[in-house]
Amino acid sequence: MDQKTKEIVNNIMNYVIGKGASDEIKKNQHSVTKTLSLSADNLCLESIENDLWQHILDRIKCFNRDELLFLAEFMRESFSARLYPVALLYQFATINDIGIYISKIVLGNELLFNNRSCMDLPKLKYLIDCIIFYDNVKTKIEYTKRNTLSVTIDDIFEPVKNEVVDNFFQGYALYLNSIKVEDMEISNPKLRQYLTDIHLTPDEIYKQANPVIEDIVGFNYDDVDYLLYKVPYMMLNTTYSSDRENRFHIKIMRNDFIGYFKDYISEEHLINVLKYLSINHCLNDGKHNNREVELRCITENDGVLSFAVRTIVECLGIFKRITITGHYMDEVTYSYQKSKLELHSTDLIKQQQSMSTYFSYVVAELFESYGYLIAKDANGYPDVDIKDIIVNGSRLVFNDIDVLAFDRNTNTIINCELKYYKVKMDYAGMTKDALNKEKYESLFKRETTLKNNKSAIVKVVFGLTIPDSSIEVKSIVVTSRQNYNTKNITEYNFEEFKRKLLNNETL
């Protein structure tokens, strides 16, 4: 990449995150208004969306195809490296979203590009503002009822006015930075060995899942682990780096990429990895959703692969996290893999259940570490996923208490429900009200049974003799990840839960 292109890319990055760009944004908004012949009022959002998309396609043809793809990679790479983690100051899109849009438009449409053109900063800024505007209009149509109403020129460029949107990125940062179940550790050596013996640690669960995921996508988690370790070394050793100073972006012949790893991963598996990561392959298979494209990061042209090192590492890491629980398998798999996906549907459910059970052991150990009594099995290990308890010769059916604990300071039985949420990949997933009242019916039934048998349960499970009148029952939900669901019960994400225990706060 020459010096002029570098300067333009840096200028674009600063522009995207809002540094001194307000006047130019207003100028470009005025140009869009004029080009699309938008009147002062009675504007239809869906009509604007269609017209603007066509306008973007017309504008993007004026650029050099490879330079656009490089810019898209650079944006996504910078977001992966958290060099530019900031959302646009006045918009909903991020540099990651803009990079995905550009890749999708360039590779997913039969366009005749002006490949002899040079990067033009004002034209690029205008194109990006059009993409931002398009994303904003789509957001309004999808997440508000405004698409059934007319809007004015002054209003059309404003982002969605919603408290959830205002707080989205602050909460999303907490979500991204929170520890994942796959990374949670058991500190008790005896319990850790027990879980290893029964194949219930994340490492063991991944080992068991290897043949399942390999049969579905054609490569396995061992391959992913090796690539996660080895790919960063490519920017130090390959002679195909597109920019020796930057070292983040690599152009390499497809056969050379395969040759770089084939001593450790079979050629067949490597070919399938490249198919999975290829944006071209994704679009050709009919996957055009931004979130589906986001899972991929390699662009192909005449046998040459182009990608950003940090982004390929992030995409592989995301693949490993979301597939172990069977989440987003429709987005991960291609059309020709659907039969294998259906064949292994039960296996994927078992993997999720195993990871959820491991989560129960982690939470139970935390309770005990901070002075709570916990239900234990005959061998002295935490008794999780409790189905029933025998009290005075009678069997009390609970079906599934994830963790049962007792606070000796307040004489409170803690009925703990765990939610192992799938990774949320977009705004809709983060804000969807998935936890309706019915989701808690079983939890409330268990709570009622506990309240009706308080002293007997405390005696049988925790070995304490305390009268009913002195015992309270509290139900809480601990989620593996941050979420924005409407709550009708006390709920903590895992980080909040740990902090509560650490500070000896009442749950």
Model-derived segments and spans:
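Active-site beta-strand-loop-beta-strand hairpin of nuclease catalytic cores
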Residues: 405-425
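Active-site metal-binding core of divalent-cation-utilizing nuclease and nuclease-like domains
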Residues: 376-411
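Catalytic cores of nucleic-acid endonucleases
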Residues: 420-479
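Extended, amphipathic alpha-helical scaffolds
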Residues: 335, 362-363, 376-377
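Accessory recognition modules or surfaces
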Residues: 332-346, 353, 359, 385-396
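Composition-driven low-complexity segments enriched in polar/acidic and proline residues
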Residues: 1-350, 479-507
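A short, highly charged nucleic-acid-interacting micro-segment common to nuclease
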Residues: 341-363, 367-368, 433-438
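Short helix/loop segment immediately N-terminal to the Walker
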Residues: 183-184, 191, 382-387, 456-467
